[in-house]
Amino acid sequence: TDIDSIAKGAPTKGGVTVRGLEEPYVKRTVEGDLGMRYSAPSVVEAIGPKNMLNYVPKEIGEKELINYVDKISDDVKYVPNNKKKKQIDYGIAKVATKLAIKRHVGRIETVYGPFGASHVQYGKDLTKLDMMIGTGGVLAHSDNPGEILRHGIYDSNSPEVLAPVEPELLLDKEYILSCIGLLSEIAPDKALTLAKKHLKKV
Protein backbone atom coordinates (compact mmCIF):
# COMPACT_ATOMS: atom_id res chain seq x y z
CA THR A 1 0.00 0.00 0.00
CA ASP A 2 1.58 3.25 -1.17
CA ILE A 3 0.66 6.65 0.25
CA ASP A 4 1.67 9.98 -1.27
CA SER A 5 1.01 13.39 0.26
CA ILE A 6 1.64 16.86 -1.11
CA ALA A 7 1.50 19.32 1.77
CA LYS A 8 3.75 21.21 4.16
CA GLY A 9 2.25 19.40 7.12
CA ALA A 10 2.94 22.23 9.56
CA PRO A 11 0.98 22.30 12.84
CA THR A 12 -2.61 23.43 12.38
CA LYS A 13 -3.11 24.36 16.02
CA GLY A 14 -1.30 26.86 18.18
CA GLY A 15 1.12 25.90 20.91
CA VAL A 16 2.47 22.86 19.08
CA THR A 17 6.23 22.26 18.76
CA VAL A 18 7.60 20.23 15.86
CA ARG A 19 10.34 17.72 16.58
CA GLY A 20 12.28 15.30 14.43
CA LEU A 21 13.60 15.54 10.89
CA GLU A 22 11.96 17.98 8.49
CA GLU A 23 9.32 16.27 6.38
CA PRO A 24 9.41 16.64 2.57
CA TYR A 25 6.64 18.64 0.89
CA VAL A 26 6.08 15.70 -1.47
CA LYS A 27 6.23 12.55 0.63
CA ARG A 28 5.81 8.92 -0.39
CA THR A 29 5.67 5.88 1.85
CA VAL A 30 5.54 2.30 0.60
CA GLU A 31 4.20 -0.29 3.03
CA GLY A 32 5.35 -3.60 1.57
CA ASP A 33 3.74 -5.55 4.39
CA LEU A 34 0.27 -4.12 3.78
CA GLY A 35 -1.10 -5.64 0.60
CA MET A 36 -4.02 -7.55 -0.85
CA ARG A 37 -2.33 -10.85 -1.75
CA TYR A 38 1.31 -11.71 -0.91
CA SER A 39 1.25 -9.64 2.25
CA ALA A 40 -2.40 -10.09 3.24
CA PRO A 41 -1.35 -12.26 6.24
CA SER A 42 0.78 -9.33 7.45
CA VAL A 43 -2.29 -7.07 7.42
CA VAL A 44 -4.17 -9.52 9.64
CA GLU A 45 -1.13 -9.97 11.88
CA ALA A 46 -0.69 -6.20 12.25
CA ILE A 47 -4.18 -5.69 13.63
CA GLY A 48 -4.73 -9.15 15.10
CA PRO A 49 -7.19 -11.81 13.82
CA LYS A 50 -9.85 -11.00 16.40
CA ASN A 51 -9.78 -7.28 15.57
CA MET A 52 -9.81 -8.13 11.86
CA LEU A 53 -13.20 -9.79 12.35
CA ASN A 54 -14.66 -6.31 12.92
CA TYR A 55 -13.96 -5.50 9.26
CA VAL A 56 -15.56 -8.56 7.65
CA PRO A 57 -19.13 -9.99 7.64
CA LYS A 58 -20.27 -11.24 11.06
CA GLU A 59 -20.81 -14.81 9.88
CA ILE A 60 -17.10 -15.19 9.14
CA GLY A 61 -15.12 -16.78 11.94
CA GLU A 62 -11.44 -16.50 12.74
CA LYS A 63 -10.55 -19.87 11.20
CA GLU A 64 -12.34 -19.10 7.93
CA LEU A 65 -10.67 -15.69 7.79
CA ILE A 66 -7.18 -17.10 8.30
CA ASN A 67 -7.79 -19.89 5.77
CA TYR A 68 -8.91 -17.34 3.16
CA VAL A 69 -5.95 -15.06 3.79
CA ASP A 70 -3.53 -17.99 3.52
CA LYS A 71 -5.20 -19.02 0.26
CA ILE A 72 -4.91 -15.63 -1.43
CA SER A 73 -1.32 -15.15 -0.31
CA ASP A 74 -0.44 -18.42 -2.05
CA ASP A 75 -2.67 -17.86 -5.09
CA VAL A 76 -2.01 -14.18 -5.80
CA LYS A 77 -4.08 -14.17 -8.99
CA TYR A 78 -7.20 -15.31 -7.14
CA VAL A 79 -10.32 -13.20 -7.73
CA PRO A 80 -13.22 -13.53 -5.25
CA ASN A 81 -16.19 -15.32 -6.81
CA ASN A 82 -18.90 -14.52 -4.29
CA LYS A 83 -20.09 -11.64 -2.14
CA LYS A 84 -18.72 -13.00 1.15
CA LYS A 85 -15.20 -13.39 -0.21
CA LYS A 86 -15.36 -9.94 -1.78
CA GLN A 87 -16.28 -8.53 1.63
CA ILE A 88 -13.20 -10.16 3.16
CA ASP A 89 -11.08 -8.53 0.46
CA TYR A 90 -12.71 -5.17 1.20
CA GLY A 91 -12.02 -5.70 4.91
CA ILE A 92 -8.34 -6.30 4.19
CA ALA A 93 -8.31 -3.14 2.05
CA LYS A 94 -9.90 -1.08 4.84
CA VAL A 95 -7.33 -2.19 7.40
CA ALA A 96 -4.41 -1.75 4.97
CA THR A 97 -5.63 1.78 4.23
CA LYS A 98 -6.04 2.62 7.90
CA LEU A 99 -2.60 1.33 8.89
CA ALA A 100 -0.78 2.79 5.88
CA ILE A 101 -2.25 6.25 6.52
CA LYS A 102 -1.39 5.97 10.21
CA ARG A 103 2.24 5.25 9.33
CA HIS A 104 2.40 8.03 6.74
CA VAL A 105 0.93 10.94 8.66
CA GLY A 106 2.38 12.60 11.73
CA ARG A 107 1.32 12.21 15.32
CA ILE A 108 0.94 14.57 18.22
CA GLU A 109 1.94 13.81 21.78
CA THR A 110 1.32 15.54 25.07
CA VAL A 111 4.53 15.95 27.06
CA TYR A 112 4.50 16.86 30.73
CA GLY A 113 7.29 18.93 32.24
CA PRO A 114 7.95 21.19 35.22
CA PHE A 115 5.89 23.97 33.60
CA GLY A 116 2.92 21.80 32.72
CA ALA A 117 1.79 20.06 29.56
CA SER A 118 3.03 20.86 26.07
CA HIS A 119 2.14 19.41 22.67
CA VAL A 120 4.79 17.94 20.38
CA GLN A 121 4.27 17.01 16.73
CA TYR A 122 6.29 14.36 14.91
CA GLY A 123 5.84 14.12 11.14
CA LYS A 124 3.25 15.89 8.99
CA ASP A 125 -0.06 17.27 10.20
CA LEU A 126 -2.46 16.40 7.37
CA THR A 127 -5.69 17.08 9.25
CA LYS A 128 -6.56 20.02 6.97
CA LEU A 129 -5.85 18.18 3.72
CA ASP A 130 -8.86 18.83 1.51
CA MET A 131 -8.64 15.93 -0.94
CA MET A 132 -7.86 12.22 -0.88
CA ILE A 133 -7.55 10.25 -4.14
CA GLY A 134 -7.63 6.47 -4.18
CA THR A 135 -6.24 4.31 -6.97
CA GLY A 136 -5.58 0.62 -7.31
CA GLY A 137 -7.27 -2.66 -8.11
CA VAL A 138 -9.39 -3.21 -5.03
CA LEU A 139 -10.64 0.39 -5.05
CA ALA A 140 -11.30 0.42 -8.78
CA HIS A 141 -13.33 -2.78 -8.57
CA SER A 142 -15.06 -2.17 -5.24
CA ASP A 143 -18.81 -1.61 -5.05
CA ASN A 144 -18.15 1.06 -2.42
CA PRO A 145 -14.63 2.53 -2.72
CA GLY A 146 -15.58 5.48 -0.53
CA GLU A 147 -16.12 3.15 2.41
CA ILE A 148 -12.57 1.84 2.03
CA LEU A 149 -11.08 5.34 1.71
CA ARG A 150 -12.98 6.56 4.76
CA HIS A 151 -10.91 4.21 6.88
CA GLY A 152 -7.95 6.48 6.12
CA ILE A 153 -9.46 9.65 7.55
CA TYR A 154 -9.14 11.05 11.07
CA ASP A 155 -10.48 8.80 13.83
CA SER A 156 -11.58 10.50 17.04
CA ASN A 157 -10.67 7.30 18.89
CA SER A 158 -7.04 7.92 17.88
CA PRO A 159 -6.74 11.73 18.10
CA GLU A 160 -2.94 11.55 18.12
CA VAL A 161 -2.93 10.38 14.48
CA LEU A 162 -2.92 13.49 12.27
CA ALA A 163 -4.90 12.09 9.33
CA PRO A 164 -7.20 14.22 7.12
CA VAL A 165 -10.43 15.14 8.91
CA GLU A 166 -12.86 16.02 6.13
CA PRO A 167 -11.20 15.42 2.77
CA GLU A 168 -13.13 15.15 -0.47
CA LEU A 169 -12.84 11.52 -1.54
CA LEU A 170 -12.06 10.83 -5.20
CA LEU A 171 -11.44 7.65 -7.17
CA ASP A 172 -8.98 7.14 -10.01
CA LYS A 173 -10.81 4.20 -11.55
CA GLU A 174 -8.95 4.33 -14.87
CA TYR A 175 -5.39 4.47 -13.46
CA ILE A 176 -4.82 7.88 -15.03
CA LEU A 177 -3.38 9.76 -12.06
CA SER A 178 0.27 9.25 -13.00
CA CYS A 179 -0.47 10.47 -16.53
CA ILE A 180 -2.13 13.58 -15.10
CA GLY A 181 0.98 14.23 -13.01
CA LEU A 182 3.30 13.98 -15.99
CA LEU A 183 1.04 16.12 -18.17
CA SER A 184 0.85 18.81 -15.48
CA GLU A 185 4.55 19.57 -15.97
CA ILE A 186 4.03 20.72 -19.56
CA ALA A 187 0.30 21.49 -19.80
CA PRO A 188 -1.17 22.13 -16.35
CA ASP A 189 -4.50 23.41 -17.66
CA LYS A 190 -5.04 20.28 -19.74
CA ALA A 191 -3.99 18.12 -16.80
CA LEU A 192 -6.57 19.83 -14.60
CA THR A 193 -9.28 19.33 -17.22
CA LEU A 194 -8.35 15.66 -17.46
CA ALA A 195 -8.45 15.28 -13.68
CA LYS A 196 -11.88 16.88 -13.40
CA LYS A 197 -13.19 14.58 -16.11
CA HIS A 198 -11.80 11.28 -14.87
CA LEU A 199 -11.48 11.55 -11.07
CA LYS A 200 -14.88 10.73 -9.60
CA LYS A 201 -16.27 11.62 -6.18
CA VAL A 202 -17.06 8.63 -3.99
Q: How should each PLM-predicted stretch be described?
A:
Residues T1-V202:
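Helical "lid/coupling" subdomains associated with nucleotide-phosphate turnover
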